[in-house]
Design a protein with these regions (language model features):
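Beta-rich, blade/repeat-based domains predominating
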Residues: 1-10, 38-53, 74
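Structural signal for beta-propeller blades
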Residues: 19-21, 62-64, 77
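Surface loop/turn motifs at the tips and blade-to-blade linkers of beta-strand repeat domains
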Residues: 33-37
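Surface-exposed loop and turn segments in beta-propeller and other repeat-based domains
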Residues: 91-97
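Short, conserved, GDST-rich strand-edge loop motifs in beta-rich repeat architectures
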Residues: 58-74
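Conserved beta-strand positions in repeat-built beta-propeller and related beta-rich domains
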Residues: 11-16, 53-62
């Protein structure tokens, strides 16, 4: 579903319906796979002051009709720990008050 890049040029992809996030290199080779407690992962991004926190969002409602006890991470933000990567600044916006 959603995706982002890290500072080394890897692409991180949220895998809707697969309950995981993949880290791919420039050739498309999977370098890491992180399994999550949510089936429908929606997006992934780097956060924090130095963009070293990897945050994943998941959907609470889906057409798949998963039982809540089978998808206890649904509708939550999940932080992936131990990934040893950092993000790159994308776009910044100034929102007027």
């Amino acid at each position: 579903d959603g995706m982002c890049f890290d500072s080394e040029g890897h692409i991180w992809v949220a895998m809707w319906g697969a309950g995981s996030v993949l880290k791919l290199d420039q050739t498309g080779t999977v370098r890491a796979k992180y399994c999550l407690p949510a089936v429908n992962v929606t997006n992934v991004c780097f956060a924090g002051e130095v963009l070293d926190r990897l945050i994943v969002s998941s959907a609470r409602i889906s057409a798949d009709h998963h039982k809540p006890e089978e998808d206890y991470g649904a509708g939550q933000l999940i932080e992936i720990m131990g990934h040893k990567s950092s993000g790159i600044k994308q776009c910044q916006a100034q929102i007027p008050k």
